[in-house]
């Protein structure tokens, strides 16, 4: 039965990790109705490490762009020195941008999980960023031109600014992709570049978060049995496959549409969560 739950959770992770609707928020909701029959320590680790499947999809889909020594496609010759230089610069921007979230997130991670990993905080963050998306798309974007239309032209300073918004996503319900996209739009980065840079920015952040959770899991005296390993592996594989589809969907979507729909979705979901939390509290 846990393997079926792992498949469902993998689907949820694969969809919500890349769309700006908060994967953590959706996993909190899912945990209310689809609980793994495992220890609390394993479930805490599972909710983070499942992201490995999602982030590996980025590495696979964008391998040609992320690997400075790879061919652009099978028919191309080796990358030119200029293309190699641009790839290394992209990695430097990603690493620079990941620093604030790492510096602030590492010491605060456990405290934030303890105090904000609940329905009500998640609901409020869903609503707040939902409103932010709608306001930015309807009020800010129409009055400001996009100044960065190519990821290779993204300034280092802009990359750092975007990650300062990613720091806000440490609060469950915010959405890592949502926070970085909001930040990118505010500083004049196009929707396409904002989405793509968000994908890349997730690589060090999510690998790092998964490594830390695994380390804490074993450091606290826990062990991983064969069934738990299988459940985690299945969830990661499903998240990987679904993420491939979700990423392609988002990259195509932002070419023709803005993020208003996601803002509305977040607001509706946040309100539903608040009603559910109030109803649950009323029933005791």
From Swiss-Prot:
Q: Reaction(s) catalyzed by this protein? A: di-trans,octa-cis-undecaprenyl diphosphate + H2O = di-trans,octa-cis-undecaprenyl phosphate + phosphate + H(+)
Could you tell me the membrane topology recorded for this protein?
A: Multi-pass membrane protein
* GO CC, alphabetical: plasma membrane
Q: Name one GO molecular function term.
A: undecaprenyl-diphosphatase activity
What residues form the membrane-spanning segments? Answer: 7-27, 44-64, 90-110, 116-136, 167-187, 197-217, 229-249, 259-279
E.C. no:
3.6.1.27
- Which cystines does this chain contain? none
Q: Does the keyword Transmembrane apply?
A: yes
An example GO biological process term is: cell wall organization
Cellular location(s): Cell membrane
Additional info? Bacitracin is thought to be involved in the inhibition of peptidoglycan synthesis by sequestering undecaprenyl diphosphate, thereby reducing the pool of lipid carrier available.
Task: Provide the function of this protein.
Answer: Catalyzes the dephosphorylation of undecaprenyl diphosphate (UPP). Confers resistance to bacitracin.
The record's comment on protein family reads: Belongs to the UppP family.
* Record's protein name: Undecaprenyl-diphosphatase
Q: Which organism is it from?
A: Lactococcus lactis subsp. cremoris (strain MG1363)
Q: Which gene encodes it?
A: uppP
